[in-house]
């Protein structure tokens, strides 16, 4: 197997296959669940709006892939600084049956100099999650500056985040290798690689993109680190490219680019 094919197979099994569009329907989510089951293995998870969790759970069970995790989003996509609403949404997501919650960090508050609200929001959302995985989206493409990206990453980790995630996919600039490096370096420098993972989201579209991101993680945190409890790709159009790279052709087309 070529290096690119090996990276494509690895990336496929680390995907949070995503649809977070205003026109999502039960039918689209059912199709997403079908796409998560491929001839070369399943994606790690699907990522959907909370209201679709019951139909997704049913579909994954019926197609024999109950191990595919269901991630959902809260405080999404704007990252407001209302802790009460973020926590209420997170509790509702857990009640719906989410396996993982991707919450948006109040990044604009941090840009305005408020570090406390972000810490408290993440801390309380993690308390609401209990053992359920909490990924925190810091919106790197809006923070832009290295100091802010690293500060947001540190705050999330100190507050109990299980993963730090680049982006919502809803702003002009989403994951970039530069932003990924900054966040991975925080995980390394804080000595939390055993318990904190990383998720680039939005803009990872090809096997070559995925291979470069994985090579960076291997370089910074070691070649064994990026397993499915420490690394995810938030993407949709990536899956088709990975399957094409792996020469798998009988897969349904997946949702709009993320």
Swiss-Prot record:
The active site is at residues 102, 165, 199. It is an enzyme of class 4 (lyase). GO terms for biological process: 2-deoxyribose 1-phosphate catabolic process; carbohydrate catabolic process; deoxyribonucleotide catabolic process. Its EC number is 4.1.2.4. Keywords: Cytoplasm, Lyase, Schiff base. Pathway: Carbohydrate degradation; 2-deoxy-D-ribose 1-phosphate degradation; D-glyceraldehyde 3-phosphate and acetaldehyde from 2-deoxy-alpha-D-ribose 1-phosphate: step 2/2. It is found in: Cytoplasm. InterPro entries: Aldolase_TIM (IPR013785), DeoC (IPR011343), DeoC/FbaB/LacD_aldolase (IPR002915), DeoC_typeII (IPR023649). GO terms for molecular function: deoxyribose-phosphate aldolase activity. Belongs to the DeoC/FbaB aldolase family. DeoC type 2 subfamily. This is Deoxyribose-phosphate aldolase 2. The gene is deoC2.
